[in-house]
UniProtKB/Swiss-Prot annotation:
Binds 1 zinc ion per subunit. Zinc binding seems to play a structural role. GO terms for cellular component: cytoplasm. This is Galactose-1-phosphate uridylyltransferase. One of its GO terms (molecular function) is UDP-glucose:hexose-1-phosphate uridylyltransferase activity. The active site is at H179. It catalyses: alpha-D-galactose 1-phosphate + UDP-alpha-D-glucose = alpha-D-glucose 1-phosphate + UDP-alpha-D-galactose. CDD domains: GalT (cd00608). InterPro entries: GalP_UDPtransf1 (IPR001937), GalP_UDPtransf1_His-AS (IPR019779), GalP_Utransf_C (IPR005850), GalP_Utransf_N (IPR005849), HIT-like_sf (IPR036265). The lineage of its organism: Eukaryota, Fungi, Dikarya, Ascomycota, Saccharomycotina. Belongs to the galactose-1-phosphate uridylyltransferase type 1 family.
Amino acid sequence: MSFDLTDHSHARYNPLTDSWILVSPHRAKRPWLGQQEKPGRNDAPDHDDKCYLCPGTTRATGEQNPDYESTYVFTNGYPAVKLEQPDPELTVSNCDALKERLFKLKGVKGNCYVICFSPKHNLSFPQMAQSEIMNVVKTWTNLFQTLEKEALEENKPYKYLQIFENKGTAMGCSNLHPHGQAWCLDSIPSEPAKEFDHFEKYEHQHGAHLLEDYVNLELREKERIVCENDSFLVVVPYWAVWPFETMVLSKRRIPSLNQFTDKEREDLASIIRNLTIRYDNLFETSFPYSMGLHQASLNATEGELKAAWFHMHFYPPLLRSATVRKFLVGFELLGQPQRDLTAEQAADRLKALSGEVHYLAKLEQEESKT
């Protein structure tokens, strides 16, 4: 008997985080009697007077939204980090060296923003036009440039802008209205910091950027590519943890949104739409995920720019159907991450789907014929 990647347990290395993932493809055959999520039906109206993100409504802070017609950004009234707060009083004491060694603390300052993708309450990326997603990409870019300028000219404590979206109740999203968030901190958060560290080490050892080599390898092998265009490709990473996890990778070395050409902005909007349509079509549901952008820090140094390579991570939880999700528990919390479906199997399923026609649009077309 020879080793079979589609049936035998093995571990795969993630060079971005210097970690390993256990792959157990034979477990995909096991029956499931556990928790099931509610199917993602979207019967919401275009506008909801009770939604604090819809145009013209009043937010919990008492501020009223304008009658916006495209994207809309506002400062989060309940931010995770704040600009105005005192620095912690850190005392140095030789008599308690153990406490100082183990109980480390530092203050964190910054600002948090909410980004409404559309004035329509019941839309998400896969049902938006490419031009509407393009407006979101431009908004991300404008926010990056604005905060970079404020840090430089007004000495605001802005170092890294983490843009992300939690879509669906399965990912903890409490509001259906299409929106994302942007948290700007005075330091680089742990996940991108780990990536930067490994990018620098890889280039020092091999003379090339890790993601440059990875993009070229995936383009050569093709088996994990879901879709691509002139500027970007979408892959299920070789080391993926979540069942249908993907990365959106720029084909050239672009440090951040700030360095995009107009064509690259168009291509990013196009590939986000293509990927998210495939996600919804997979189980014919509004597919939940957490998504985020990884890019250069604000006002990056020459070394920081060299280490950066723009990419996006999509982490969707659904595993077998619209109602069965993956949980990171037990061995995965105490040992290491584990997955059942191989990255290649997941990519095959996603690439077989349409990235142009949403399942609801197809359903409407079929119903109109009857």
